[in-house]
Amino acid sequence: MTKKILLIEIGTEELPARLLSKISLYFYKNFIKELDFHNISYKNIKYFSTPRRLALKIKDIDITERFVEIKKRGPSIINSYDKDGFLTEAATRWLKHCGININQAIRLKNEKGEWLFYKTRKKQENIESLIPKITESALKNISIKKSMRWGQDNQKFSRPIRNIVILLDKKVIPGDVFNITSKNLLQNHLSLKDSQIKIKDAKDYPKILLEKNNIIADYFIRKEKIIEDIENIAKKIKGFIKKNNVLIEEVTALVESPKALLVNFQEKFLQIPKKILINTIEKKQKCFPIYNSEKKLLPYFIFISNIQTQESEKIIIGNQRVMHARLSDAEFFFKNDRKVKLESRLLSLKKVLFQNNLGSLYEKTLRIKLLIKWIAKYSSSDVEDSIRAALLSKCDLVTDVVCEFPELQGKIGMYYALEDKEKKDVATALEEQYLPRFSGDKLPCTLIGCGLSIADKMDTLSGMFYIGNIPSSDKDPFALRRLAIGIIRIILEKNIPLNLEDLIKKSLSLYNKKNEEDLILFDKMIKFFMIRLFHWYEETGYSAKIIKSVLSCKSIELIDIHKKIQAISFFKKLKDSQSIILSIKRISNILAKEKEKINGDINKKLMIEKEEIILFNNIEEFDNYTKNLFLEKKYNDILIKIKSFENPIYNFFKKVKIYHSDSKIRLNRLLLLSKLKKIFFKIADFSYLY
């Protein structure tokens, strides 16, 4: 077995920073799939990525000449020869298909009979000719939504590919990938893009890049170096860096030869609101702000350069100038905004379109005001404060700061509201209205914030359904699924007793749609929410069967649904709960056989067997015991009580003949079973649990 090191490096133009990790991981996984498909063994694979290269290093790849055994069974011997001993047409066709004569065929005999059989060994394609094909296939199968095309051949990838290296130990593997011939010249740093780095042996990768031009090809090593460097620099000025994994990942994907540099800015800029300052440094400039021990910003930031140079001072001065300009703009926008109060911007929203056919942001604000007023009755939040928050909710969208930094919407509204001496809960709600922003994000903390978030999201959902912008199976351009999950989470996790049906109807009514399409829209929205609810519970870890058993009962109160799902999950874990479920199944099967509806009241006088009387008494006792439990939605207690039916049901089926010769007695017993089924199905459709 011959084993060698295989190196593949794909030199590209600058890859998108936000996609670099995804692209490199897909390349790695796709390549492994290709190796497995071709039965090529190896010890391990390591992948590398920088903004201008994707690479794989495969250790101990087996390049031994390989053979595959081919077996082909032909027609049976009986069908292969005629009565005179000559080959039949079926046998002749099979021999021709195999490319052999009858002397090369053998006979395969077993207990079922005897057939013509052909067995041979075929040499597989040489691994050296396979690798370029495998590489191109692995790259082409990377799932990228947006790609670029280049060259006369109209090649397609995330960014144009400019260089290919395929090296097996010291040997260059000849072949083309994206019509680029492989060689042993690695793509150099962007500052030296006209020159290349010659690599003689695959084992030298990625060390040779570091030695020649300080390029760190390993994404994870590069990331750790950046973290270590910025922390050390911050310590030197008695500061620290707050963890920001998103920024770290982005910067790591932007550079391949990182060098951390300390840069200062004028202290006057510390008067700018902290969130504006941080946003400018982190989001706009991709730099790291530094904090003191009291978690206050220091007049410094750290910039990650993409080049190792002796002229660091020039880079520092350049970044100082750029940051000064950015912070000056932010300072100007902030001061300009504070010339007027936040509330005075309300009428300006009339000039801002919310969505085609849905009016302006001012009209949306008025709808939110009416909806939050209605929600406040259920959330126990202050009605006047809720209305105030609604009226201010979109005012920051026409401020200079938010126009320049859209990601600060809500945050700036809260800050300006506090400056205007608005109540703290009202101001906080302006930021909280956008929560949760993504899966697993935090929820609003204030009751007003919860109400405002629900009202805003529900108004958007209703509006989009109203104009037909409904998500399809693969497209959701307005992130309506996320909005629905946000509403669901707030109602459930904050225990707000909102009826989803009433909420949707109230929201739709604010669009003044009063015709036969009302019901169609409502049904579409309910279905949309129920699908989202199902998926959310499934992702949370609940059994799909349990979720379906509860949702199929058409309950629209989310808190009620939640309690039922929790209770059924609890019940399923109880000892012997399965026997009750099987009893319910038996009852359902008996009732399903009846062609006519089973209607009427149970007549105790028609009960002649002790076991049916005991079962009836148990039902009456259960109804009395659980009457208040149902009102209080104590489903755990109800299900525990349901377990008390286990023996009475068992004895009933054992001793009582349901299909009695007397039709009245038979009907009475079926009514008894029907009553039992209704008890169980008040909580969930147990047929999903069988």
Curated annotation (Swiss-Prot):
Gene Ontology terms describing biological process = arginyl-tRNA aminoacylation; glycyl-tRNA aminoacylation
Gene Ontology molecular function terms on file: arginine-tRNA ligase activity; ATP binding; glycine-tRNA ligase activity
Which InterPro entries does the entry link to? DALR_anticod-bd, Gly-tRNA-synth_bsu, Gly-tRNA-synth_heterodimer
Record keywords: Aminoacyl-tRNA synthetase, ATP-binding, Cytoplasm, Ligase, Nucleotide-binding, Protein biosynthesis
Recorded E.C. number(s)?
6.1.1.14
Its cellular-component GO annotations read:
cytosol
- Establish whether keyword Membrane is in the entry: no
| Catalysed reactions listed for this entry | tRNA(Gly) + glycine + ATP = glycyl-tRNA(Gly) + AMP + diphosphate
Broadest EC class?
Answer: ligase
Compartments where located: Cytoplasm
* Source organism superkingdom: Bacteria
Family matches, as PANTHER family: GLYCINE--TRNA LIGASE, CHLOROPLASTIC_MITOCHONDRIAL 2, GLYCYL-TRNA SYNTHETASE
Q: Which family does it belong to?
A: Belongs to the class-II aminoacyl-tRNA synthetase family.
The record ties this protein, via HAMAP family, to:
Gly_tRNA_synth_beta
Query: Sorted alphabetically, which NCBIfam families does this protein's record hold?
Result: glyS (TIGR00211)
- Subunit structure and binding partners: Tetramer of two alpha and two beta subunits.
Q: What is this protein called?
A: Glycine--tRNA ligase beta subunit
